[in-house]
Amino acid sequence: MQVRAVLVLAVVALVAVATSRAQLNFTPWWGKRALGAPAAGDCVSASPQALLSILNAAQAEVQKLIDCSRFTSEANS
């Protein structure tokens, strides 16, 4: 009885493995995104102006958080 249960479990596992598909290596070009995949070096190119505007926006938000924290601590004391 135990041998039969192990055999049935093995068959179920083999059928599950045979009917499923998996991709073991995940890259930026897997799945539906692969249709319009950029060339090898395209995904790392960014203009300096775009990077500077992102940096400036982040710095402005950090400054707002600092000011808000300072205002809150002054109001509580």
Swiss-Prot record:
Main location: secreted
Keywords for this protein: Amidation, Cleavage on pair of basic residues, Flight, Hormone, Neuropeptide, Pyrrolidone carboxylic acid, Secreted, Signal
Species of provenance: Locusta migratoria
InterPro entries per UniProt: Adipokinetic_hormone_CS, AKH/RPCH_hormone
Name of this protein: Adipokinetic prohormone type 3
Subcellular location: Secreted
GO cellular component, one term: extracellular region
Family: Belongs to the AKH/HRTH/RPCH family.
Function (record text): This hormone, released from cells in the corpora cardiaca, causes release of diglycerides from the fat body and stimulation of muscles to use these diglycerides as an energy source during energy-demanding processes.
Signal sequence residues: 1-22
Keyword check for NAD: no
Top-rank lineage group of the source organism: Eukaryota
UniProt GO molecular function: hormone activity
One protein family per Pfam: Adipokin_hormo
Any single GO BP term: flight behavior
UniProt key word Ligase: no
Residues bearing the modification Pyrrolidone carboxylic acid: Q23
Residues modified as Tryptophan amide: W30
